[in-house]
UniProtKB/Swiss-Prot annotation:
The gene is rpmA. NCBIfam families: L27. GO terms for molecular function: structural constituent of ribosome. It holds the Pfam family Ribosomal_L27. It comes from the Bacteria. This is Large ribosomal subunit protein bL27. The lineage of its organism: Bacteria, Pseudomonadati, Pseudomonadota, Alphaproteobacteria, Rickettsiales. It comes from Rickettsia peacockii (strain Rustic).
Amino acid sequence: MATKKAGGSSRNGRDSAGRRLGVKKADGQYVIPGNIIVRQRGTKIHPGMNVGLGKDHTIFALIEGRVEFLTKRNHKIVNVNEIAST
């Protein structure tokens, strides 16, 4: 039996691709219904007014308006505020 592993072989060299998570629309940015605002694992940011929560915890806009991030009782929350029509 050989006591040394054959040369030219490697056990490393593989990795999974990044999942492209994070905030997709910034505070104050304009969104339309269906726009993804945050992609996340778990609810790091909680849904607020006029946003929906997907089964993979993606937060998306339900109405047309501007994105607003805020903190309430140690929870980060994202809302979409309706733009006042003139």
